Amino acid sequence: MNGYNFTDRVRMVLQMAREEAARLHHEYVGTEHILLGLIREGEGTAAAVLTCLNIDLEEVSGRIEETVKPGKAAAPAGPDLPYTSRAKKVLEFAMSEARQLQHAYVGTEHLLLGLLREEKGIGAQVLMDAGVTLQEARSEVLRLLGTERGETAATATPVLYTPDARGSLQLAFQ
């Protein structure tokens, strides 16, 4: 499949991730910034999953702030911040999770599962240190989607992805 529908919430989370990276004077968007974006957004299925798993979102946010120190130089703002290879992997895994669940959209729940599936990034490490496992999160997503149906495809906006010459994923965020 050459394109996926990212919900408006996911697009907002990714914008917030860029803002968090800039706030911390980082010259990149990493998994920690994506997790901060998910926490800051706070109303999507991912936030509901974490809350149902008794995860204190403020504590997780504080843990990230303790782990990553602010950069020294002013970071470029906006869409110019590059995604780290781990952050790109999270997005790939999020699309894979959506595909496995046979969803035509990528919601915050898929982004959360992508973070956990990536395993090695700061975002995943902080979540795992807080006691979140991929299996528990996936089970909770399935439980919540059974009643709430997740974020609707009606709020999804197409975001195309294509491999570049080196085979890495290039995302076209609008």
Where are these regions (language model features)?
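Histone-fold recognition with a strong bias for associated Lys/Arg-rich disordered tails
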Residues: 1-174
